[in-house]
């Protein structure tokens, strides 16, 4: 199985769906969802996160380039066939995208301003 073909995105759709899974519908509490000591519940939640974020990526890719869009299947059966190494790799990839796509433009602009200010101060 080539897990590198499974892509993830954090879109408004993904955030809404993920929030529904989280305690009190708060997406910033996703860590609580995924730290459940019950392994069955924890892996079920992880699959749901992967499924939602992959679906979000697919929706976005289809919207961005409908003529060249080629869907990539991701199913519960595929998830259950992952090795521990693949699961760890996929988890890292999903949460890298979760963090990256969750940043706001305001935060990005603020960083640019800080860098610009630091550069000007050092001159």
Label each PLM-derived region with a short phrase.
Residues 1, 49, 111:
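A contiguous, well-structured "functional interface" segment within a domain
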Residues 24-38, 62-123:
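Charged interaction scaffolds used for protein-protein
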Residues 1-46, 123:
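Short N-terminal mixed-charge amphipathic segments
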Residues 37, 53-60:
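Alpha-helix C-capping/helix-to-loop hinge sites
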Residues 44-56, 92-96:
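Short, hydrophobic/amphipathic alpha-helical patches that form generic packing surfaces
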